[in-house]
């Protein structure tokens, strides 16, 4: 099993190019199921989760071509022939985003059988809002033997437009219902919709495919169903979480980096907090020049839905707070059980206590290298940042979590001067 070994204490310096957004690529890949024509995608990140999704789509019947040898960011997907409407447990257990095939399969094939999802062990993340919305659109749904079995009755019928108010803001729920609604008969209104940029990116692709969607970027999406969608070309938006992770790394280690091919306008909440911590920034349309001198200042923050501070950046900024001057309170409102990295940070010498959904960090001057274990995707990134800032050698085990969401992270850090390597 791969591990990352690093020796901390080197300020980061140089340029880093951000990959496409994992959380946009996964629903966008599923959107190809809505049409029998080719969909051309660019800037798709080469991540374990993406490879898992591509394998699932191939099992369903999608053909996938990579026109440029050695370039997995550019692909052509063709779902002309759907040979199965099932996503098996073996495929879904490793990645909960597999649930995103449910809406497209139900909309186009009028039936779908999808295993209840797996993925990161950071909370229940139930799919009840997906089911509630699809039922409102006329689907008959049963949970049987660990599978969601959905169909329209009679099976030749399309889904029907409906007004849907979800009980909570759900990103994958919004995406599933949005995709399903594009081929429904009539108009669907999604109230309390997620406003994340990745949802907007999916909607932009669907519009290119012939969908009629208004309210993109707002919490109220109106979708006028069409009979058929066609092929399209689309480039996935840059990954704001990867960009934010590198910004946190330079705050923790010091130095000066330029984050290229990013979308600064999607990072407002993160940049505000990092500036509070002491980061100096110069921002262009698709780049951020970031420099840090001295010890960071502790910052309080609270996670919430976009445009507020993202839960996927909580662990990384907590690492900054672990070595900051002062004490801080970090409140997690999105997922329960998302403080599993705290125990590992404390192994490195951090002083962090948990009270309910709040972590209280007393900043220490230095962390000391140790062997630590990644517990989920973003926790693994936080431990890498901690290792880069710590004195001595740190080893992060179970790095497969990191590979699910970061494209060649250790190679990018090496180019910035970090002393880091992947070992077996």
UniProtKB/Swiss-Prot annotation:
Q: Where in the cell is the protein located?
A: Cytoplasm
**Entry-linked InterPro entries:** Enolpyruvate_Tfrase_dom, Enolpyruvate_Tfrase_sf, MurA_subfamily, RNA3'P_cycl/enolpyr_Trfase_a/b, UDP_GlcNAc_COvinyl_MurA
Q: Which cysteine-cysteine pairs are annotated as disulfide bonds in the entry?
A: none
The active site annotation covers 120 (proton donor)
Q: What is this protein called?
A: UDP-N-acetylglucosamine 1-carboxyvinyltransferase
Species of the source: Polynucleobacter necessarius subsp. necessarius (strain STIR1)
Q: Establish whether keyword tRNA-binding is in the entry.
A: no
Primary localisation category: cytoplasm
**Which residues of this UniProt protein bind phosphoenolpyruvate?**
22-23
Any idea which positions bind UDP-N-acetyl-alpha-D-glucosamine?
96, 125-129, 312, 334
Q: Which gene encodes it?
A: murA
